[in-house]
Amino acid sequence: MAKSDVIEVDGKIIEALPNATFRVELENGHIILCHIAGKMRMHYIKILPGDKVKLELTPYSLDKGRITYRYK
């Protein structure tokens, strides 16, 4: 899948789940499950409930995503 196929949206972490999975509320009110991108795991970037994040969704499955950035 090419990088241009992803949909980038912003959201807010609602709940931290096991295995670096999070429940995220999007700006439009939808709630989806997201996991942390590999580079964020490598650099030990911590994500807590209440953080604002950028995430990627694929056009094939809009109920799961990948967190790619945590806003400061």
Swiss-Prot record:
GO terms assigned for molecular function: ribosome binding; rRNA binding; translation initiation factor activity
Entry keyword annotation includes Phosphoprotein: no
PROSITE patterns tied to this protein: S1_IF1_TYPE (PS50832)
SUPFAM superfamilies associated with the record: Nucleic acid-binding proteins
GO cellular component, one term: cytosol
Domain of life: Bacteria
Principal subcellular localisation of the protein: cytoplasm
Subcellular localization: Cytoplasm
Function: One of the essential components for the initiation of protein synthesis. Stabilizes the binding of IF-2 and IF-3 on the 30S subunit to which N-formylmethionyl-tRNA(fMet) subsequently binds. Helps modulate mRNA selection, yielding the 30S pre-initiation complex (PIC). Upon addition of the 50S ribosomal subunit IF-1, IF-2 and IF-3 are released leaving the mature 70S translation initiation complex.
Family: Belongs to the IF-1 family.
Protein name listed in UniProt: Translation initiation factor IF-1
Organism: Sulfurimonas denitrificans (strain ATCC 33889 / DSM 1251) (Thiomicrospira denitrificans (strain ATCC 33889 / DSM 1251))
